């Protein structure tokens, strides 16, 4: 079961996602990212975007995934509420393919909160927890 949360980090907002699999943790942290931007519970799954990124390690894969979502948000004005992520190991590291579900930003409907300027490696952790679940976290630049 995937879930996400925000956590206190000085003047910033940390985002953290949990999942039964690595993919679910990536999905959950992406939801947490968009919940920093808007109220994701008010976003409907009207449009889908496909994302493909690579990374030499899991940290760069997560960074590239979230950065690509932020680029789509900035260019197309879309906000997302759900994701389907597939990760595979490659000779050069990892490859991620995802579907992102959401709709055009409507300030009246989605209740904009913060502007995320960039994804960062600040406080980034990706780990398998003792209970077998996965956790992914970082602090984006607000």
From Swiss-Prot:
Q: What are the GO MF terms of this UniProt record?
A: calcium ion binding
**Record key words, sorted:** Calcium, Metal-binding, tRNA processing
Give the UniProt record's GO annotations in the biological process aspect. Answer: tRNA splicing, via endonucleolytic cleavage and ligation
State if Acetylation is listed as a keyword.
Answer: no
Residues that hold Ca(2+) according to the record: 12, 141-142
Instruction: Work out whether the entry's keyword set contains tRNA processing.
Output: yes
Record-linked PANTHER family: ARCHEASE, PROTEIN ARCHEASE
Oligomer status and interactors = In solution, exists as a monomer, trimer and hexamer. Oligomeric states form a tripartite complex with tRNA and PAB1947 methyltransferase.
**What is this protein's function?**
Activates the tRNA-splicing ligase complex by facilitating the enzymatic turnover of catalytic subunit RtcB. Acts by promoting the guanylylation of RtcB, a key intermediate step in tRNA ligation. Can also alter the NTP specificity of RtcB such that ATP, dGTP or ITP is used efficiently. Chaperone or modulator of proteins involved in DNA or RNA processing. Protects the tRNA (cytosine-5-)-methyltransferase PAB1947 against aggregation and increases its specificity.
The similarity annotation says: Belongs to the archease family.
What protein name is recorded for this chain?
Protein archease
């Amino acid at each position: 079961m995937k879930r996400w949360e925000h956590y206190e980090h000085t003047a910033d907002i940390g985002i953290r996602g949990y999942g039964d699999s690595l993919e679910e943790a990536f999905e959950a942290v992406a939801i947490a990212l968009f919940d920093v931007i808007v109220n994701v519970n008010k976003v409907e799954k009207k449009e889908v975007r496909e994302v493909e990124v690579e990374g030499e390690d899991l940290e760069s894969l997560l960074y590239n995934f979230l950065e690509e979502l932020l680029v789509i948000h900035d260019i197309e004005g879309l906000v997302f509420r759900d994701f389907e992520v597939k990760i595979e190991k490659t000779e050069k590291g990892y490859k991620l393919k995802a579907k992102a579900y959401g709709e055009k930003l409507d300030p009246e409907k989605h209740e904009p909160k913060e502007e995320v300027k960039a994804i960062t490696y600040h406080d980034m952790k990706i780990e398998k927890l003792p209970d077998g679940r996965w956790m992914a976290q970082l602090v984006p630049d607000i």
